[in-house]
Amino acid sequence: MSLLSRALGMAGRASVVAVGASIASAVLVGIDQRRGAAPKIPDHPGPYSPEEREAAVRMYLTALTAPAAAFRVPFARDCVRRENGLRTGFNAAQLQWDLHLHLQYSVIREVRDIVLTVDPPGREGVVHAEFTLATVLGVKARVSEDFVVPPEDCLIHSIDARIAVG
């Protein structure tokens, strides 16, 4: 085995160890943050106002770019997420960890041009969001999401996202 192939092999193993250590570190930080964080829900019994329900959705949008906010997103325990019809989120814990570990969200640089509509006509309990994602690669995506956030509990029960790149 040549010196070059040994060096490349060692570099490859070192990079795997570094990635593993980075993920382990993120998990440990997440466990600590999860322990100290509570979902951001107004401190009074419902029904909750449109502004409070909008704030629940804004916390989710914040967590797309700020992993530290992941455990403050007020998900219902059985919350599901769909992207363009494909189920990508299965429960609150999985959604919070996805946001915290930030693997699929790490390309998002900024969430902008946010327009929220609470209870669009004929859709009680829905907060509709339209916004643009700017990525680190320079690609923009237009997103339209419907969040089911009933006034009774102010928790996000489901997210239906439609994403168009370009």
Regions found by a protein language model. Name each.
Residues L3-G166:
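C-terminal and inter-domain tail/linker signature
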